[in-house]
């Protein structure tokens, strides 16, 4: 067993790569399972050795890729606390939030040979849980859209400004009123703990979605 800092072997980049790929798959799957877009724009693929649904709509795919491309440098620096997929009704009020809480330890005690395969097994369990989450959630009203929120540590603000210039992709400070839900129902979906990453996924669901 070897103890490394996050700077050794550029391990922050490895974690960011793994998380970015996972979050891309997760966002596509959430949009499919929660029927935010017609099922016809999705195709079955295989990720983490399980079948998943991925969008084949170019503009939607580009938005998701651009978003996560800008999140990746923040993940690399361990500046991300949460990534939230918010599903909004026609009035742009949130009806559901899929919250990925992410914690990366400053010291990594790892066996590098088995590291990635172990993490991928844990991420597979998240994907399987998302695939069946509609069983514990109420139906959403028609005409929903979505957005992605990133909760960062305070020190990340300057990094985000730099990323905006480099990536030409505008981050906008979220208005708490726009994304707030009064007394939502909390549904825990999955938690993982590994040597390089701790992550928790839960859903906040609005009590009366059609009102």
From Swiss-Prot:
One of its GO terms (biological process) is telomere maintenance in response to DNA damage. Residues 13-203 form the HORMA domain. One of its GO terms (molecular function) is JUN kinase binding. SUPFAM superfamilies: The spindle assembly checkpoint protein mad2. The keyword Cell cycle applies. Keywords: Cell cycle, Cell division, Chromosome, Cytoplasm, Cytoskeleton, DNA damage, DNA repair, Mitosis, Nucleus, Transcription, Transcription regulation. It holds the Pfam family HORMA. InterPro entries: HORMA_dom, HORMA_dom_sf, Mad2-like. Residues 21-155 are annotated as: Mediates interaction with REV1 and REV3L and homodimerization. It is found in: Nucleus; Cytoplasm, Cytoskeleton, Spindle; Cytoplasm; Chromosome. One of its GO terms (cellular component) is site of double-strand break. This is Mitotic spindle assembly checkpoint protein MAD2B. It comes from Mus musculus. The lineage of its organism: Eukaryota, Metazoa, Chordata, Craniata, Vertebrata.
